[in-house]
Amino acid sequence: MSGGTPYIGSKISLISKAEIRYEGILYTIDTENSTVALAKVRSFGTEDRPTDRPIPPRDEIFEYIIFRGSDIKDLTVCEPPKPQCSLPQDPAIVQSSLGSSSASSFQSVSSYGPFGRMPAYSQFNTGPLVGPQFGAVGVGSSLTSFGAETTSSTSLPPSSAVGTSFTQEARTLKTQSSQGQSSSPLDSLRKSPNIEQAVQTAAAPHAPSTATVGRRSPVLSRPVPSSIQKTAESPEQRKGELHKMQRPDIDQLKNDKNDPSKRQPVLSALQPRRGRGGNRGGRGRFGVRRDGPMKFEKDFDFESANAQFNKEEIDREFHNKLKIKDDKPEKPVNGEDKTDSVVDTQNSEGNAEEEEVLAGGVCYYDKTKSFFDNISCDDNRDRRQTWAEERRINVETFGLPLRSNRGRGGFRGRGGGMGFRGGRGRGGERRGAPGGGGFGPARGFRGGFRGGRGGREFADYEYRKDNKVAA
C-alpha cells in the first residue's frame, strides 16, 4: 500500500496468521500501537486454507474489529472509497441526512468512545445541528467522512448554514485522523468564524449544546444576595463606628473602671459595636481600643515601695526555711507543732521562736568539713554486704526472675560462675559432668552447657538460704 493513495474508507480483505479472512471498511491505521481498525467486518473463516483449526464463515457483521499488525498475514484492497454525492449550496438547507440505502458512503463519525483515541464508526447519524458528543457543527453529528479523501471537493455535502469553510475544516480533520494524530478536532473547529455564526443561527431547542462550541455562553450576572452585601459591608461599618467614638467616652471609661455598677453598662455598650468581626473574621475581642503605651504622671517612688517590706523579717523567714529540724521530737511551741511553724512563713512570731528552738539542734551540713551533707546517709557503718543480703534486696526491688528451661545455659566456659555442675557442684567445664547433680530437685535437664546432660540455668534454681557458692 503506497502512502499517497487514500485507503481510508476502502473495502479491505484481511487474512490473519490463523488463516481467517475478514472483509471490512478500513477505518484507521494506528502507527504508534501498530493496529488496523476495520468497520462493518464480516468473517469468512479459513476457506480451505491449510490450518490445524478450520473455522467456518459467519454471517454476523461486526461493528468494528481492531487487528494487531504483527498478526496480519495479508491485506488487499478490494474496492476504493466511493465518492459522495454532494448537495447544492442552497441557503434554505439547514440539515440533511442520506437514507440507509446508500450505506457504502460511510459519511459520519459520532464518538471517540470504542477506540480510545480513534473515533468510532457509525452510519448516518441524524443528530441535531450541534453534535451532542463534543459540540462540533456539521451535517448530522458528523466530524469526518470516510468517503473521498481525494483532491476533489467531495468530502461532505456542505449545508448553507456552515458554508464552504466547514468543508475545509472537515478535510483537515480527515487528514489528521488518517495520519494517526491525536489532536482534538475541537481546537480546529473553534478557530472557524463561520462555525460560530452557524451556532448563533441554530434553533432554540439546540441552545443547551451550543455552549460547548465556539464561544462559550456568557455567564449570567446574578444579583448578589442582600445578606452577602451586608456581610461585606459590616467590617467597614464597624470600623467607622469605632472611629466615631469620641474621646470623652474613653475617658469616662477610665474614670469609671473602679466602679462595678458603672463599668458593666459601658462594657456592654461597647461590645455590640465590636461584634464578632473584630479581627478579620475572628470571633471578636474585648471592646476597649488600644490607645498606645501607658502614660505615667510622675516617677516611681522606690523609697515608699521599699518601706512596705521588712527586710529583717524576710531574712528571718528565709533562714528558717533553710534550717532542718532535729530528729528528736520536741514540744510544740505556743500550742503549735514545730513543723507547722516552719511551713507557715506568714507568722513572724512563730518563726522567731522556731529559730531559737533549732539553734541548738544538730548541724547536718558543715561546708568547712566536707562538700556533702550527712542527711541522706542511712547507715554510718562501714561494712560489706553479703551475697544473700544483696540477692534479697534485688528480689525485693526487681522481683523473682523468670524461669526459662529453653536454650543453652547462660554460663559457659571455664569457671562456670553459678553453673552448679556435677556431683560435687564443681562448675564450669565444657565437658558436662555425667551426673545430674546440683541443688534443688532434678528436673528439666536441658543440657545447659555444650555436651552436658545435667546442666541447668541459673534462674532454674530456687533461692535457699543454705545455698553457698562452691569454692
Curated annotation (Swiss-Prot):
Q: Where is this region: Disordered?
A: 146-165, 171-190, 197-292, 323-354, 404-456
The protein's matches in CDD domains, at most eight in alphabetical order, are given as: LSm14_N (cd01736)
Q: Where is the composition biased (Basic and acidic residues)?
A: 233-262, 323-341
Q: Where is this motif: FFD box?
A: 363-379
Where in the numbering of this chain does the DFDF domain appear?
Answer: 288-324
* Residue ranges of every copy of the Sm domain listed in the record: 1-81
Under the heading SMART domains, the entry gives:
FDF, LSM14
Q: What stretch of residues is annotated with the motif TFG box? A: 382-402
**What Pfam families does this protein map onto?**
FDF (PF09532), LSM14 (PF12701)
Q: Which PROSITE patterns match?
A: DFDF, FFD, SM, TFG
Coarse class of the primary localization is cytoplasm
Q: What's one GO-annotated cellular component?
A: P-body
- Modification comment: Phosphorylated.
Task: List the keywords (alphabetical).
Answer: Cytoplasm, Developmental protein, Phosphoprotein, Repressor, Ribonucleoprotein, Translation regulation
Q: Which family does the record assign?
A: Belongs to the LSM14 family.
Swiss-Prot/TrEMBL domain comment: The RGG repeats are required for interaction with ddx6/Xp54 and accumulation in ribonucleoprotein complexes.
| Name the UniProt record assigns to this protein | Protein LSM14 homolog A-A
Q: Which organism is it from?
A: Xenopus laevis
- What lineage does UniProt assign to this protein's organism? Eukaryota, Metazoa, Chordata, Craniata, Vertebrata
